[in-house]
Design a protein with these regions (language model features):
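N-terminal Rossmann-like FAD-binding beta1-loop-alpha1 element of flavoenzymes
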Residues: 1-9, 15, 19-51
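Predominantly flavin-linked oxidoreductase catalytic cores and closely associated redox partners
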Residues: 44, 137, 141-142, 146-318, ...
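N-terminal FAD cofactor-binding segment of flavoenzymes
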Residues: 46-111
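Helix-loop-beta segment of a Rossmann-like dinucleotide-binding subdomain
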Residues: 113-137, 145, 173, 291-293
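FAD-binding beta-loop-beta segment adjacent to the flavin cofactor pocket
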Residues: 330-361, 495-509, 518-536, 543
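Active-site-proximal substrate-binding core of FAD-dependent oxidoreductases
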Residues: 357-363, 375, 379-437, 551, ...
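C-terminal auxiliary extensions adjacent to catalytic cores
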Residues: 434-486
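Iron-sulfur cluster-binding cysteine motifs and their immediate structural context
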Residues: 528-560, 567-589
Length: 593
């Protein structure tokens, strides 16, 4: 049993004796694990309580993805669901746009493109027959409703800020952040104490580079335990446009286009990894975005500005004519693949979804693998808890104090024999091949897809962190990006408004310079790398300013702009920023992402 505390601003505190069989730090895989667990419990007439925390203001508010959705795992969980009845908030089917046309282009310059690469020459994993163009956030909202119907408790606007451990160092749950604390660290009139949630098992589905997940990976040595390479990431920047069908005859629902080449790869041995996507979703939306591997070398490169100039290419702009940008956002994604997956279990909890790193970077998809990992997690946890009838939560939903948190080792075993690992094994060396250059990487990916098929007896390694790949500014010239025209391209602060980002101003900063780094780290960043944080952040959080009467620049952190992409915790020189959760409900308010 534990005490679940609410502290209210008017000074009263109430304690409740609630325990949970199963708890989550929220991410895309959350709902599928929660639903599967409740399905198993109800089928066996067990009363088990499941709790989910969502740091966004509502379910789906912090979800951002391409998204061409592969329904394989969704169909496993809902074999009898008619997809036309999976509805968004406006009563439209989330799955109303099946992929009808697949196109892959190599852009040779800002004006030209080579002929489309024939599908027969592309890896089968890039084919999208049977997939759907969707809003992943809308699907999450539907999934949240399904979970609540089954009795899952979802607390939106609560940010998991701390992992809780028992006397044996096993995870016993999480704590949420106190709210109503001012910048000065003192409680305001709106102060509410954070709450502790204790659970028999806690599943961490925080998405790529989750703060609690990263703590657990380090604390339990999960990378070392699995001989995993350092994770490598990409930054995805996305917009949603709505076009006037009377003014744009190029719109075709179900049209899918990916590009490589210009503007990132300007010569055959370019080591900058990345490309673009552009999807047409009924009735009139164009979903488009740009992904840049964060292992790039040039500190002057700006993923956001590369995205903006890419939109001016004729093979892109023709789909935006007569339209308007209605939403903007950004998020990092895992690109390390199979080699970078840590050990998945530890006493009292597990990692699932992109917290573990199951994204397939060749497919440019991770939602289907996140769903599958959630299903496998629920099955493994339920099976373990079922071994001892007395270990189930009792009639008062109290946790048996004598029953210590378990490590669900079967989850690791079951994932390794699942189709997720089979899929990732087939492309395990493809991303690392691009470290030798763009053309060698493309050639290797082709051979791996059509000949080797994952059976190569060697491993191409990613030996270092993305932050270590940045080279000194002296090796490069500053990039002269074109000015945004306000039609196809936009300045960053204008676009940021389309993300709906909001944080309470009077709260402690959630982006903090690590004490062991101090000002020395950012001073070295500006002196050696010319301040790359000014360029890679897709929200204008970091800038170097000169105060009146001063001659030297200083770092200014505009934490209120943060879209929670996590890029700074990855690419910052010396990784000197500690990304922590702000007050729950803050951050972007994505509706269509």
């Amino acid at each position: 049993m534990f005490m679940f505390w609410f502290a209210f601003g008017f000074g009263f505190a109430f304690g409740f004796a609630f325990g949970f069989a199963f708890g989550f730090a929220f991410g895309f895989g959350f709902a599928f694990a929660a639903i599967k667990f409740k399905q198993l419990a109800l089928a066996n007439e067990k009363e088990l309580s499941v709790c989910v925390l969502e740091k966004g203001a509502e379910v789906g508010a912090h979800i951002l993805s391409g998204n061409v959705f592969e329904p394989r795992a969704f169909d496993e969980l809902f074999p009898d669901v008619d997809k036309s009845e999976v509805l968004d908030g406006e009563g439209n089917s989330v799955f109303n746009t099946p992929v009808e046309e697949d196109k892959f282009l190599f852009l040779t310059s800002e004006e030209k493109a080579a002929p489309a690469i024939p599908n027969a020459l592309l890896p089968s994993q890039l084919h999208n027959e049977g997939n759907y163009v969707i809003s992943l956030g809308q699907l999450c909202r539907w999934m949240g409703a399904q979970a609540e119907e089954l009795g899952v408790e979802i607390y939106a606007g609560f940010a998991a800020s701390e992992v809780l451990y028992d006397e044996s160092n096993a995870v016993k749950g999480i704590a949420t952040r106190d709210v109503g604390i001012g910048k000065d660290g003192k409680p305001k009139d709106t102060f509410e104490r954070g709450i502790e949630l204790h659970a028999r098992q806690t599943v961490f589905c925080e998405g790529a580079r989750g703060s609690c997940s990263e703590e657990l990976i380090k604390k339990f040595g999960l990378r070392e335990a699995n001989s995993a390479q350092p994770q490598t990431y990409g930054l995805g920047v996305k917009e949603v446009w709505e076009v006037d069908l009377e003014k744009n005859e190029n719109f075709r629902p179900g049209f899918v286009q990916h590009t490589i080449g210009w503007p990132l790869q300007d010569h055959p041995l370019s080591k900058t990894f990345g490309g673009s996507f552009l999807y047409h979703q009924a009735p009139n939306r164009v979903l488009l975005g740009f992904v840049v591997g964060l292992d790039y070398e040039n500190p002057y490169l700006s993923p956001y500005k590369e995205f903006q100039r890419w939109k001016h290419h004729p093979e892109v702009s023709k789909y935006l004519e007569g339209g308007a940008c209605v939403s903007y956002g950004a998020r990092v994604l895992n690109e390390g693949g199979l080699h970078s997956i840590p050990k998945l279990t530890f006493p009292g909890g597990i990692l699932a979804g992109c917290s573990a790193g199951f994204l397939n970077s060749v497919k440019i998809k991770g939602s289907h693998t996140a769903i599958k990992s959630g299903i496998v997690a629920a099955e493994a946890i339920y099976e373990e808890l079922s071994k001892d009838e007395e270990s189930f939560v009792g009639v008062n939903f109290e946790i048996n104090a004598e029953d210590k948190p378990k490590e669900i080792v079967s989850y690791q075993e079951n994932m390794e024999t699942s189709w997720v690992y089979e899929e990732l094994k087939a492309v395990r060396n493809c991303h690392a091949a691009f470290h030798y250059g763009f053309l060698p990487g493309m050639m290797y990916a082709g051979v791996a897809a059509h000949v080797l098929r994952g059976n190569e007896p060697w491993t191409l390694s990613n030996a270092s962190e993305d932050s270590d790949k940045t080279k000194p500014a002296s090796a490069f010239q500053e990039i002269n990006y074109p000015k945004p025209d306000g039609v196809f391209s936009f300045d960053l602060l204008t676009n940021l408004q389309r993300s709906g980002t909001y944080h309470t101003d009077d709260q402690p900063a959630h982006l903090r310079i690590k004490p062991e780094c101090g000002s020395k780290a950012w001073k070295d960043s500006i002196a050696t790398y010319d301040g790359p944080e000014q360029n890679f952040c897709p929200a204008g959080v970091y800038e170097y300013v000169i105060d009146d009467g001063e001659t030297e620049k200083r770092l200014q952190i505009n934490a209120q702009n943060c879209v929670h992409c996590k890029c700074c915790s990855i690419k910052m020189p010396h990784q000197y920023i500690n990304w922590t959760v702000p007050e729950g409900g803050g951050g972007p308010q994505y509706q269509l992402m």
